[in-house]
A protein has these predicted regions:
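Conserved small/polar residues in nucleotide/adenosyl-binding loops
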Residues: 279-284
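Basic, alpha-helical nucleic-acid-binding regions used in initiation and control of genome expression
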Residues: 71
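C-terminal membrane-solvent junction of multi-pass transporters and transport-like membrane proteins
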Residues: 192-193, 252-273
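Membrane-embedded transport module
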Residues: 2-60, 74, 78-253
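Conserved cytosolic catalytic loops of P-type ATPases
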Residues: 67
């Protein structure tokens, strides 16, 4: 019971008590404070500054003139639509409906967009790692470039562009709200994503390199044009797997969940399927 009271006392403080603390004491106490009563504008601003000093990302809501300093110094200042003009000018955005649910929805959309960017980077870097290794592998076995410059440009400019639009437009998911907050200094490609990029890129390379070696040893004259065309088509078709991997990245659901509702994803899959056929007809 005594421990609970002590913990509760640490979570509550008055404006006068907060002002009486030294900077060192305020720095240590800031992480435990949950309620501050009779707080003046300078007290709120100091609390924001101490939390920022501890590396926290601080958002402040307020509707009065006395909230303006804290709204201005916070990373994200959120004024209420019914608040004063001073509070609105000091804030970064205004909640027109005065609802905390709008803040939660904004966080959900932001986290979902961040995850979609991670998905696109995963997709594109896997393609680039596999293509780079294939070009190097082709030079090792003494064959001509298995992927031509035109083919690489097609993959990067056409397929990657539409894949970016499809992955970036995936609808937000409530499951991102269960994630822990990230530090502002965290790199967008974390260790697990980096490992997945290398693993999938190497697997794609091994599959395609085995096909390249087979075509090289199959004929006496090396790899002919038709085999290179088949090689490129196979490389593009493997990106089906890559795209589904990217869609399911860091998700607890299968990539086929709500598949028919993802029109952008369907468009990319059609493009991946039809594109190589059209390219082959033009080159032949």
């Amino acid at each position: 019971a005594d421990g609970s009271l002590t913990s509760l006392d640490q979570q509550m403080i008055t404006g006068e008590q907060w002002e009486a603390l030294s900077d060192e004491e305020a720095y240590e106490r800031a992480k435990d404070i949950r309620v501050m009563s009779r707080a003046r504008p300078t007290d709120k601003q100091r609390l924001v500054a101490m939390l920022q000093k501890r590396g926290e990302v601080v958002a402040v809501t307020g509707d009065g003139t006395n909230d303006a300093p804290a709204l201005h110094y916070a990373h994200v200042g959120l004024s209420l639509g019914s608040g004063t003009s001073v509070a609105k000018e000091a804030s970064d955005m205004t909640l027109l409906d005065d609802s905390f649910k709008s803040i939660a929805n904004a966080v959900m959309w932001g986290r979902s967009l961040y995850r979609n960017l991670q998905r696109f980077l995963f997709f594109q870097l896997v393609v680039n790692v596999a293509a780079l290794l294939l070009v190097l592998g082709g030079s090792v076995i003494g064959t001509e470039m298995p992927l031509t410059v035109t083919q690489i440009l097609w993959v990067n400019l056409i397929m990657d562009t539409f894949a970016a639009l499809a992955l970036a437009s995936l609808p937000p998911s409530h499951e991102v709200m269960n994630e822990k907050p990230r530090k502002a200094s965290d790199f967008i490609i974390n260790k697990s994503i980096g490992f997945g990029i290398l693993f999938c890129g190497i697997v794609f390379f091994l599959v395609m390199f085995a096909l390249l070696v087979y075509c090289e040893r199959r004929g006496k004259g090396g790899v002919d044009v038709h085999e290179l065309t088949m090689f490129f088509t196979t490389f593009v078709m493997i990106q089906f797997w890559n795209l589904f991997n990217a869609k399911a990245l860091m998700s607890h659901h299968t990539a086929f969940r709500h598949f028919l509702k993802d029109r952008g994803m369907i468009l990319v899959l059609v493009l991946v399927l039809v594109g190589p056929v059209s390219y082959t007809q033009l080159t032949l």
